[in-house]
Every structure is written in structure tokens, then in C-alpha cells.
Design a protein with these regions (language model features):
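N-terminal export signals
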Residues: 2-19
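Short, glycine/proline-biased beta-turn/loop segments that scaffold the active-site neighborhood
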Residues: 103-118, 200-202
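Structural recognition of the beta-strand scaffold that forms the well-ordered cores
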Residues: 45-47, 127-129, 333-334, 342-345
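Active-site SXXK
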Residues: 32, 46, 52, 76-105, ...
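Short, conserved catalytic-motif segment at the N-terminal edge
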Residues: 22-80, 101-103, 150-153, 354
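Short, surface-exposed loop or secondary-structure junction motifs
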Residues: 57, 62-64, 118-321
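Short, surface-exposed beta-strand/loop micro-motifs that present aromatic residues
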Residues: 322, 329-342
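A short acidic/glycine-rich loop-to-helix N-cap element
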Residues: 350-363
Length: 378
């Protein structure tokens, strides 16, 4: 069982394993096999959880194609990319909020005074968490800046593109800023804060920022960098990489066991069951229900996506009210409290040359739809 999970063993494995009579996960398995066969992804590790159990797990293809082929493995560690945002940075912010360190609707500049520059003085913590801040999608990478301090200067100098609260624009700058907020208020670097206050309570021993070089063979590589070196255990996101591998928007590495445990612990806490998840139930409910301005139709929780054009991992059957997130490298996690289910897909779709583009969008949608159908979600 995965109830209250930290690092706990899988209850069931393999295609077709299910918690309800007649459930058939063969269509899920076929979708994943076909994606590998077409070259849409080099390899994939996937899991479907339901009722506290893993009811399907799939491992297909290769975790590496270059410099030499390596078979995919359930224990492969992946660059989680933007899944860092809702799984690490947002809960870190909310832990500090639970402690009374700040309110969600206070200006960010109250805690980070330099953030007030360039018209950002009224942007709130909630607006960063929901991507309604008005800030641009990312820092400018056209100039050759390097280092955390250089990134901080650029964040503080960033000028909004539009008024806060006007429109949903997904922005890495929002979560870089939130990572800086966590560090400033807690007095800890974000990676150390996450290890101590999020990963350790959940028993996520295979997760963290800047993995040790000795773990390289267990990590799925992404693509060649500008120096023609294959990135492996080094964050793929170029902004996070320039920042040294630790940032609020990207940098987490993890594997299927740890991410499945995270998902189940969150669902358990949300439902009021026993759980190691390091936030209160009311906080989890707040994070996973719409928190954007009331008159806006792009629905965002605090860190989590609910109903926007990014919500393809919901598929065609899981309801609005389910929630999740994606990562650029080819990762996604979607959770449905109504059916007590989650769908986890881990790939390094950018390997080896940054290709394998929009096919991942269709794969996420189709796998979620097939999984929901197998679970009897209509």
C-alpha cells in the first residue's frame, strides 16, 4: 500500500494490474510502447495510482540513446524540470505561510525590498504562485550572464509586461522569485530547505537538487549543451543551469517511486487520511483549488495547474477539479481527488538533441484518458 507513503514498496506492478474488477491497462501500455517505437520519446517510466495502490506501472525504451544505448529502468532518475515548482517551491512557501511568516496577499517587496523596482511594488505572493503577476515568461538569456547573483539582479530589475491580475502568463520569474523568498525568510538555501522540510519527511531518498556525480549512470540524460557535452545530472533548464542548478522554477531530480509516494501522500492529506505530507489539510486544499482572480477563466491553484491550455495531462475524462503539472523535459503528474487517482509520466523527451517536440502533449492526454477509462472515470 502507498497510504501515508514515504518510500514504500509498490503494491502492484505491470500492465493490467488494477483495483477494480475488469480494469484493463493494456491501452495505456500500448500508448507508451507506440510512443517509443515512433521515436516520440527515447524511453518512458509511468505509473497509475488508485485507492492507495500502484495499479499500473510501465517501463519502455531507453533512458539513453547517446553516447551508447542504455535500457530504461523503473529506478531511473529524471530531471523533473518545472515539476519543481508545485512539488518543492510552492509547498516550501506554504510551510512558511503556515508558520505566519507572511500573508499570501501581501506585496512580495515587503520581504524582498529590491523586488519593488520597475513597477513591481504591488505584486503579491499569491499572484506569483498563480502566474497572474504580469511578469515575462523568463529572464533574458540573449546576454551571457552567469551565476545566482546575476539572476537575482535581473529578477529584481524585471519590468512587468502587463498589470498584475490581468492575465495568466506562465512565468519562470515568478517561481525564481518565490525560491528567493523561501531562502530569505527561512535562512536556508532552497535545496537544503527542500531536503530537510519536504523530501526527508516524505522519505524521498532518491530526490534532490544537484545530484552527486556518482549517480550519473542512474540519471536519464537530456541533451548536448552549447559545448557539445551531454547533460546528465546537470539541470536541463538553461536559466537554472546558469544559476548553478538550484532555482525555484527547476532543478529537482527524482524517480518514479519517490514521485508516486509524493502524489499519494498529497492525496491522502487532502482527503484527511493519515499522511506524511508536510502541510496541513486546509493548506493542501487551498493549493489545489482555484486561487486566481475570480473573474479569470484560466484556473490555477497555488503552484498547481487546474484548467489552462497547459492542462493536457488531465486527458478527456478526469474532471476539472483534478490538478497537476508538467515539466519541459517530458515529465508530468496529474492527480484526481474525486477518483483518488494519479497518473505519472516520466520521460527525457528532449534526448539526445532537444527534439521530440509536441508529441508529448498528445501522449500525456491519451495516457490520462486511457487510465481514467480503465479506472471507470466517466
Amino acid at each position: 500500500m502507498l497510504r501515508g507513503a514515504g518510500m514504500l514498496g509498490l503494491a502492484l506492478g505491470g500492465a493490467g494490474c488494477a483495483s477494480r474488477a475488469g480494469a484493463d491497462f493494456a491501452p495505456v501500455d500500448s500508448l507508451l510502447r507506440d510512443a517509443v517505437a515512433r521515436g516520440d520519446v527515447p524511453g518512458v517510466v509511468a505509473a497509475v495510482g488508485h485507492g492507495g495502490r500502484i495499479v499500473y506501472r510501465g517501463v519502455h525504451g531507453h533512458r539513453a540513446l547517446l553516447p551508447a544505448p542504455e535500457p530504461e529502468s523503473w529506478t531511473t532518475r529524471f530531471d523533473m524540470a518545472s515539476l519543481t515548482k508545485p512539488t518543492i517551491t510552492a509547498p516550501a512557501v506554504m510551510q512558511l505561510w503556515e508558520q505566519g511568516a507572511f500573508t499570501l496577499d501581501e506585496p512580495v517587496a515587503r520581504r524582498l525590498p529590491a523586488f519593488a523596482a520597475a513597477g513591481k511594488q504591488d505584486i503579491t505572493i499569491r499572484q506569483l504562485l498563480t502566474h497572474y503577476s504580469g511578469l515575462a515568461p523568463d529572464l533574458d538569456l540573449a546576454t551571457p550572464w552567469q551565476g545566482r547573483d546575476a539572476a537575482v539582479r535581473r529578477v529584481m530589475a524585471a519590468r512587468p509586461d502587463r498589470p498584475a491580475g490581468e492575465r495568466f502568463v506562465y512565468s519562470d520569474i515568478n517561481f525564481i522569485t518565490l525560491g528567493l523568498l523561501v531562502e530569505t525568510v527561512s535562512g536556508l538555501p532552497l535545496d537544503r530547505y527542500a531536503a530537510r522540510h519536504i523530501l526527508a519527511p516524505l522519505g524521498m531518498a532518491h530526490s534532490g537538487f544537484r545530484p552527486d556525480a556518482a549517480l550519473g549512470p542512474e540519471i536519464a540524460p537530456t541533451q548536448f549543451d552549447d559545448g557539445n557535452v551531454m547533460l546528465r545530472g546537470v539541470v536541463h533548464d538553461p536559466t537554472a543551469r546558469r544559476m548553478g542548478g538550484v532555482a525555484g522554477h527547476a532543478g529537482l531530480f527524482s524517480d518514479a517511486d519517490d514521485m508516486a509516494a509524493y502524489a499519494q501522500a498529497l492525496l491522502d492529506r487532502r482527503a484527511g487520511r493519515g499522511s506524511a505530507f508536510p502541510l496541513k489539510r486546509g493548506t493542501v486544499l487551498l493549493m489545489t483549488t482555484p486561487q486566481q482572480p475570480a473573474d479569470r477563466t484560466d484556473l490555477r491553484g497555488l503552484g498547481w495547474d487546474i484548467a489552462t491550455h497547459y492542462s493536457t495531462p488531465r486527458g478527456d475524462l478526469f474532471p476539472v477539479g483534478s490538478f497537476g503539472h508538467t515539466g519541459f523535459t517530458g515529465t508530468s503528474l496529474w492527480m484526481d481527488p474525486a477518483s483518488d487517482s494519479f497518473v505519472l509520466i516520466l520521460t527525457n523527451r528532449v534526448h539526445p538533441d532537444g527534439g521530440h517536440g509536441r508529441q508529448i502533449i498528445r501522449l500525456r492526454n491519451d495516457v490520462a484518458t486511457a487510465a481514467a477509462r480503465a479506472l471507470g472515470v466517466t
